[in-house]
A protein has these predicted regions:
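Glycine-rich loop(s) and the adjacent beta-strand/alpha-helix scaffold that form part
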Residues: 235-298, 493-495, 499-508
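A glycine-rich dinucleotide-binding beta-alpha-beta segment and adjacent secondary-structure elements
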Residues: 404-489
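Conserved N-terminal/central alpha/beta ligand/cofactor-binding core
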Residues: 46-48, 81, 87-198, 202-204, ...
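N-terminal secretory signal peptides and thylakoid transit peptides that target proteins
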Residues: 1-17
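Core beta-strand elements of the Rossmann-like FAD/NAD(P) dinucleotide-binding domain
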Residues: 55-57, 226-235
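Beta1/beta-strand and adjacent pyrophosphate-binding region of the FAD-binding site
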Residues: 53-65
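An anion/pyrophosphate-binding glycine-rich loop and adjacent beta-alpha core
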Residues: 272-400
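Conserved beta-strand-loop-beta-strand element in the redox core of flavoprotein oxidoreductases
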Residues: 209-230
Length: 518
């Protein structure tokens, strides 16, 4: 059985400890005369929600995931009073499925005599993104990454080995337990609580409050019981995780219910919407996507420190054949060898997509594995894996044109026999012809979208900027919400850079807010 890591996989992981809301009494911003600024709002008072409760804090962090927790701890360490508003009942967000973080020049690396060329790494990442990402932010992140790891260690975060994971350099710092559930979330949550950070769980941030000058000075949020809370603050830090759940917003990029499955729950786009509503500039046309390919309704399971599945791993097998809803081949099937995140992209150009295999291929792949056999049976029962006695019947089962599928098979097998994929250039060692007679299979695959990366335009301080590239005072977007270092796809050349960016952006935004807003 092949093991597959899921960097953005979210589940109800038992190792993540829920923490109750910290009492709000006694928490207030520094009394330096600036509090009067928080009473004004730029919104129409007749339309503004009527709060049942009003709170006062220096900094409000929306979202208690990887970047949100980093922001909370940094803010408390900097002497600010902090409230964290989290829609779920526990802290952690997507951090529970993150296996480790990128860094250069951490003390852990120094102790192991690991050295890496920063310039070469930065150039490779810029080239892979076709220079559509922010070189300045990327450079800042790389140069600060080692100190960020050291800072996390000082907060109780536990790391294990350092290797290259799937990238080019030995820069991936594995969490001690293999995921962030116990090694990151638990110690950072405990540190935040110990430093006096207030948490409002089961509370959804809905709307930002601006003063007459356009600065963000607070927000409205709604608790699970419908109670409306107004939080007056000097800075709002959005750590809301993007909008991977919002297929209505993703439709313009080709993602539909037929070809895509959002895999990270809670990414409802509320942070994006709130920022746009107060003049923030959208970066959706240039944002990156973190995801991959999955077999729907056959979820991965956690085993031995990895998220595992048999059928879900098929998209990473290069010797199969991919076809669209018409039965046409549309890509070189070894694309995952460069980056398994890339596999999501060609699928969004299709209405539907399927992996085709003959009986010998399926038997070789499953290899008698009990879990694999169960998934094969379950998939057929759910109508996502199709089995037929011939290709014509299989075409009918998946709704493809039998004549087109026949032409596809003839062309593909011809390329296999020639040892040259003249259609899409798949490496010859992966060109395995499909039997034209006997039992055959089709496995439906969809894009598995874990995160949108960088839907809001931000500057080097992670201030959200307006359409004139001017920062909106008091408003920040961190983590994947405000990421400017990926375009189109999460490249993974710098393994763990998403998690590292979460830490760096959360800390950087807070330090700028403390310097300029408090």
């Amino acid at each position: 059985m092949e093991k597959v890591t899921r960097r953005a996989f979210i589940g109800g992981m038992g190792a993540i400890l829920a923490t109750g809301a910290v009492a709000m009494s006694g928490c207030a911003p520094k009394d330096d005369g600036k509090q009067a600024e928080l009473s004004a709002t730029g919104s129409d008072q007749s339309e503004a929600p009527v709060p049942d409760e009003t709170l006062e804090f220096d900094i409000a962090v929306v979202g208690a995931g990887c970047s949100g927790l980093a922001a909370c701890v940094q803010a408390a360490e900097s002497g600010a009073s902090v409230i964290c508003i989290e829609a779920k009942s526990i802290a952690g967000g997507a951090a529970g499925g993150v296996e480790g973080l990128f860094a250069v020049n951490s003390q852990i690396q120094k102790d192991q005599n690991i050295t890496v060329s920063m310039g070469e790494m930065i150039r490779t990442e810029l080239e892979q993104n076709q220079y559509r990402n922010s070189g300045l932010v990327l450079r800042d992140l790389v140069k600060a990454s080692g100190e960020d790891i050291d800072w996390l260690v000082s907060k109780g975060v536990r790391f294990g080995k350092v290797d290259n994971y799937v990238g080019f350099h030995p820069i991936f710092h594995w969490f001690e337990t293999g995921t962030g559930a116990e090694s990151y979330i638990v110690p950072m949550n405990e540190t935040a609580v110990g430093e006096g950070v207030g948490f409002l769980f089961d509370t959804h941030a809905d709307e930002l409050i601006c003063d007459e000058g356009g600065s963000v000075v607070g927000l409205f949020a709604t608790k699970a019981d419908g109670t409306v809370v107004q939080v007056n603050t000097r800075a709002v830090i959005l750590a809301t995780g993007g909008y991977a759940e919002r297929l209505d917003l993703l439709a313009e990029f080709g993602y539909t219910e037929e070809n895509c499955i959002p895999t990270t729950m809670g990414c409802d786009g509320s942070g994006h919407d709130m920022a746009i509503a107060v003049g923030g500039a959208s970066n959706t046309s240039n944002m990156g996507m973190l995801g991959g390919t999955t077999v729907p309704d056959l979820p991965a399971f956690f085993e031995g420190g990895y998220f595992c599945s048999v059928m879900n791993s098929l998209a990473n097998i290069p010797w199969v054949l991919w076809v669209n809803e018409r039965g046409e081949r549309f890509v070189n099937e070894d694309l995952s060898l460069a980056n398994h995140m890339i596999t999501a992209n060609p699928i969004r150009m299709c209405k539907q997509a399927f992996i085709l295999m003959d009986e010998a291929m399926m038997n070789d792949y499953v290899a008698g594995d009990a879990q694999g056999l169960k998934e094969l049976e379950d998939g057929q029962a759910k109508g996502i894996i199709f089995k037929a006695s011939n290709w014509k019947d299989l075409a009918s089962s998946i709704g493809a044109d039998a004549e087109i599928l026949s032409e596809t098979l003839e062309s593909y097998n011809g390329c296999c026999e020639a040892g040259d994929d003249s259609d899409f250039g798949k490496a010859s060692e992966f060109m395995r012809p499909l039997a034209m007679e006997g039992t055959v299979y089709a496995v439906e695959i969809k894009s598995s979208l874990g995160k949108t990366m960088g839907s809001l335009k931000t500057d080097r301080n992670f201030n959200v900027v307006d359409e004139q590239a001017e920062p909106i005072a008091g408003l920040y977007a961190v983590g994947v919400e405000g990421a400017m270092i990926w375009a189109n796809v999460y490249t993974m050349n710098i393994s763990g850079s998403c998690g590292a960016h979460n830490i760096y952006s959360g800390r950087t935004a807070v330090l700028h807010a403390v310097e300029t807003r408090l």
